[in-house]
C-alpha cells in the first residue's frame, strides 16, 4: 500500500508519459541499482531512473560549485537516489512536535566556561550509528541516543537501547508507528513505564507491533527531562556539561538528503520548520578557529553509508541554522 501511494506521488512530480533518459548514465545507474539492491517493475523503473538522473545531475552541479568555492560541503549519491525530496522527507524524517507538560529548563547562566571542542564519542558516550530504515522514527533514535549517553554517565556502561520498544508501546495517542513522534514523549514513557528495554532484547524492526516489553530486560530509567532554551549558546553549554543532546532540525532539502562531508550550510533551511530528530554529540572547528568554520557534530540515524559515516557537521553560530537549538532536550536519569 505504501509503495503504491509513493508511486502515485512520483507520477505527479514527474511527467510520467515518457521520461527522457540519458543513455550515457547507463553504467552508473546499473552500478547504483546493484549496490543498493534495487528492483522495480517495468513501469516504475523508468520513473525511478528519471528521479535518479535528476538527483545525480543536481549532485554533480553542486560539487562543481563546491570546487569553485560556492559551498562548504560536498554531496554524494546514496541509497536515497531514486526518491524525490517529497518522498524522502515523508519516509526518512519523523519529528512531530506535540503537547507536553511543563518541564525543567536548563540553567545555562550557571556555566561560564565551556571548551572550544567537544566530542562525546571519544569518551564512550555514543553507541554506533543506527538505521531507522524507511520509517519516520527519527524521534525514537534521538531519544535513545541521549538516554544511552546519560546512562553511561551514571553507570559507566554503554548499552544500546530499544527504539522498537518506544514504537510498539507508547500508544496511538502519542505516536503512530512510522508517522513521527516527539523525544520528550519518549522520555515521559520511559519514566512512566519504569524502564526501557535493551536493543539486544527488543531489536528494531520498524512499523509498530504489539508491545513486548519485559521489565527484566530494562537497561535505562528516566526521572525527568530538561528543555534547553532555544539559543545556540545554551545548547553549547548543555552539550559541554551534560553530554549528547536530542534536537530537531529542518532536513527538508536535497542538500541534506545527499550530504557527504564538510560543514552543512543550506540557505533555505528554516529555524522553525523542524521535521527530523537527531543527536548533537559535540561541536568544534574545521581548521583554525575563525568565523564561518564552526560546526555542531550531529549523529543521524540513516546508517553509516550516509554522510560522514552516519554523521553530519551542521553550521554553528549561524543564527540557529536549521533550527538546531530550537527544541533541544535531554533526560535526567
From Swiss-Prot:
Residues 1-17 form the signal peptide. GO terms for cellular component: cell junction; extracellular region. SUPFAM superfamilies: Cysteine proteinases. The record marks 138 as: Ancestral active site. GO terms for biological process: proteolysis. It is found in: Secreted. Glycans are attached at residue 173. GO terms for molecular function: cysteine-type peptidase activity. Expressed in testis and ovary. Low level in spleen, epididymis, kidney, and uterus. Expressed in primary cultures of Sertoli cells. Keywords: Disulfide bond, Glycoprotein, Secreted, Signal. InterPro entries: Papain-like_cys_pep_sf (IPR038765), Pept_asp_AS (IPR025661), Pept_his_AS (IPR025660), Peptidase_C1A (IPR013128), Peptidase_C1A_C (IPR000668), Peptidase_C1A_papain-like (IPR039417), Prot_inhib_I29 (IPR013201). It holds the Pfam family Inhibitor_I29. The keyword Coiled coil does not apply. Disulfide bonds join 135-178, 169-211, 269-322. Belongs to the peptidase C1 family. PANTHER family: CYSTEINE PROTEASE FAMILY C1-RELATED. This is Testin-2. It comes from Mus musculus.
Amino acid at each position: 500500500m505504501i509503495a503504491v501511494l509513493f508511486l502515485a506521488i512520483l507520477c505527479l512530480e514527474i511527467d510520467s508519459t515518457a521520461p527522457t533518459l540519458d543513455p550515457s548514465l547507463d553504467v552508473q545507474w546499473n552500478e547504483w541499482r546493484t549496490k543498493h539492491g534495487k528492483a522495480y517493475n517495468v513501469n516504475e523503473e523508468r520513473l525511478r531512473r528519471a528521479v535518479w538522473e535528476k538527483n545525480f545531475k543536481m549532485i554533480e552541479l553542486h560539487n562543481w560549485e563546491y570546487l569553485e568555492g560556492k559551498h562548504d560541503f560536498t554531496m554524494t549519491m546514496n541509497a536515497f537516489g531514486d526518491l524525490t525530496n517529497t518522498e524522502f522527507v515523508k519516509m526518512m524524517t519523523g519529528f512531530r512536535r506535540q503537547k507536553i507538560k511543563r518541564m525543567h529548563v536548563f540553567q545555562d547562566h550557571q556555566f561560564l566556561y565551556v571548551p572550544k571542542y567537544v566530542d562525546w564519542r571519544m569518551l564512550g558516550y555514543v553507541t554506533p550509528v543506527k538505521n531507522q530504515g524507511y520509517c519516520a522514527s527519527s524521534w525514537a533514535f534521538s531519544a535513545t541516543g541521549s538516554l544511552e549517553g546519560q546512562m553511561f554517565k551514571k553507570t559507566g556502561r554503554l548499552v544500546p537501547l530499544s527504539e522498537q520498544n518506544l514504537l510498539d508501546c507508547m500508544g496511538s495517542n502519542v505516536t503512530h508507528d512510522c508517522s513521527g513522534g516527539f523525544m520528550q514523549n519518549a522520555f515521559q514513557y520511559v519514566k512512566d513505564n519504569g524502564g526501557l528495554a535493551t536493543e539486544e532484547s527488543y531489536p528494531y524492526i520498524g512499523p509498530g507491533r504489539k508491545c513486548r516489553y519485559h521489565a527484566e530486560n530494562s537497561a535505562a530509567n528516566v526521572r525527568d527531562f530538561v528543555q534547553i532554551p532555544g539559543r545556540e549558546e545554551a545548547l553549547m553549554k548543555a552539550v559541554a556539561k551534560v553530554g549528547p543532546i536530542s534536537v530537531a532540525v529542518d532536513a527538508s532539502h536535497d542538500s541534506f538528503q545527499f550530504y557527504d562531508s564538510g560543514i552543512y550550510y543550506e540557505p533555505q533551511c528554516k529555524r522553525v520548520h523542524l521535521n527530523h530528530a537527531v543527536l548533537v554529540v559535540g561541536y568544534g572547528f574545521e581548521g583554525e578557529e575563525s568565523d564561518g568554520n564552526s560546526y555542531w557534530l550531529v549523529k543521524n540515524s540513516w546508517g553509516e553509508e550516509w554522510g560522514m559515516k552516519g554523521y553530519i557537521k551542521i553550521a554553528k553560530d549561524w543564527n540557529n541554522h536549521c533550527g538546531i537549538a530550537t527544541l533541544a532536550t535531554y533526560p535526567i536519569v
